[in-house]
Amino acid sequence: MFDDIYEVVLADSPATQAIHRKIRYHVYCVERGYEDPAAYPNGEEGDLWDDDAVQFVVRERVSGRCVGAIRLILPRTVDFPVETLGCLSPVASLNLRRRQLGELSRVCIIRTPQAWMYQGPLRSGLGSVPKERELEVLVGLVRAVTVYGLQRGIERCYVLITDAFARLLGRLGLVLERAGEPVDHRGLRSPYLYLLRDSVASASAKNEELRELFAREAMAYRRSSEIDEDTIDPDSLLIEPAVAAA
């Protein structure tokens, strides 16, 4: 079960925020090739929405290796990323106040770490997630942003995903509503609204393991400021962008 092996950390310190960006760099620039590594010479992928977002990192409990990430963009931003793409239906958020909206993005799960990523103790490096545990880690990330979002009064979040991924989430019992038309953004993707409160109820009713997971709300995440800084050291992640891109 997720909580036995992993934990989600809310990155509320410069150190863990740097790790969040390093995970994004590895997944978006190295693994998937979505972004140009040369644009991020420090090995940290970032954008203008980071200042208005809450970042989360998944790490292994025993080793301390960081293996995944997600962010929740808060409603204080002028425009959510999906709003800049011109793909939303005009009635997508008609009955919601702005402060009840967010956007989920930069969902990252590391699949293929390389030797050049490590320097110093292994517990301080980046790890990877076995294929058979990817869904488990995804659900752990979803729980973290769902619990945090509801605590902040956020009821729905935009997500820009493939229709196949939306169907996968639906099979888990998570509730998504189509919010517009497909758009070409790193491939064809569609905007959806993820209904936080409805998803907790639906997934809990559909799946016993998810019911137990959401019931352990206190374990959804903990703040990095509550963790010994010696176990979260971004300087221990030796990332050579030029080598990674080769």
Identify the function of each model-found stretch.
Residues 12, 60-62, 74-76, 106-108, ...:
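Short, flexible loop/turn elements at secondary-structure junctions
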Residues 38-44, 49-55, 80-93:
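Short acidic (Asp/Glu) patches
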Residues 52-54, 68, 100, 188:
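Residues that flank catalytic or metal-binding motifs in active/ligand-binding sites
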Residues 16, 165, 199:
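Short phosphate-engaging motifs
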Residues 76-193:
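Acyl-donor binding region in acyl/amide transferases
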Residues 179-232:
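Accessory, usually C-terminal, subdomains that scaffold auxiliary metal cofactors
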Residues 234-246:
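Charge-patterned, long linear interaction tracts outside catalytic cores
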Residues 1-45, 55-62, 66, 71:
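Short amphipathic alpha-helix that is part of the acyltransferase structural core
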